[in-house]
């Protein structure tokens, strides 16, 4: 079947996004965490999800490693595979946001163009780009998975920040200092969600 087969049409459903959001008691949005490996994306996203859950907010966290165990298990780390990885995640996260959830995504997502495509897919008003800015030297010191060590030794090729480029966001909605305490970063994000009337508490 062709990618845009004329026989495939969009089917609207009687339950709207607004109705789902009303049921949840908050807006459905996508929080896109981006940054180098070891920057703290997953840690901050996980801590924020826990804080939201404690406040009765419906959430789901999509993590870069986890999706490669299932949804993206057939993909490698070439530029083409990385692009497809982000496209798939963007589609899934968009559906979850439509369901009225606050979706947190923690992906290196090194290219601006890919992040822009996700933003366009979910809608500018429901996409919040969160740049976890941590110096490469600090990320290498942390190196929780030992990947930087392997990359420096030549055992791991095409690793972002070493021999593959990371394009930092030009104007992210949120710019976090990844060297700050996680609790401080979570507080900043909760304040943002309240100011934007995404959550109430």
UniProtKB/Swiss-Prot annotation:
Pathway: Sulfur metabolism; hydrogen sulfide biosynthesis; sulfite from sulfate: step 2/3. Keywords: ATP-binding, Kinase, Nucleotide-binding, Phosphoprotein, Transferase. It comes from the Bacteria. InterPro entries: APS_kinase, P-loop_NTPase. Its EC number is 2.7.1.25. One of its GO terms (biological process) is hydrogen sulfide biosynthetic process. Catalyzes the synthesis of activated sulfate. Signal peptide: none annotated. Belongs to the APS kinase family. It catalyses: adenosine 5'-phosphosulfate + ATP = 3'-phosphoadenylyl sulfate + ADP + H(+). This is Adenylyl-sulfate kinase. The active site is at residue 109. PANTHER family: ADENYLYL-SULFATE KINASE 1, CHLOROPLASTIC (PTHR11055:SF63), BIFUNCTIONAL 3'-PHOSPHOADENOSINE 5'-PHOSPHOSULFATE SYNTHASE (PTHR11055). The keyword Flavoprotein does not apply.
């Amino acid at each position: 079947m062709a990618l845009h087969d004329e026989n495939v049409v969009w089917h609207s459903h009687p339950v709207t996004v607004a109705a789902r959001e009303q049921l949840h008691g908050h807006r459905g949005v996508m929080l896109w965490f981006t940054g180098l490996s070891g920057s703290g994306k997953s840690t901050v996203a996980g801590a924020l999800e826990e804080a939201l859950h404690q406040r009765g907010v419906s959430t789901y966290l999509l993590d870069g490693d986890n999706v490669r165990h299932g949804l993206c298990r057939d993909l490698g780390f070439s530029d083409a595979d990385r692009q497809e990885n982000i496209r798939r995640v963007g589609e899934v996260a968009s559906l979850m946001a439509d369901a009225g959830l606050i979706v947190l995504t923690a992906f290196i997502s090194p290219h601006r163009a890919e992040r822009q495509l996700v933003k366009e897919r979910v809608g500018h008003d429901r996409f919040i780009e969160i740049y976890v800015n941590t110096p490469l030297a600090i990320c290498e010191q942390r190196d929780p998975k030992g990947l930087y060590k392997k990359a420096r030794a030549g055992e791991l090729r095409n690793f972002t920040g070493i021999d593959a480029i990371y394009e930092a966001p030009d104007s992210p909605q949120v710019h976090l200092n990844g060297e700050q305490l996680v609790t401080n970063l979570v507080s900043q994000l909760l304040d943002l969600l309240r100011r934007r009337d995404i959550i109430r508490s």
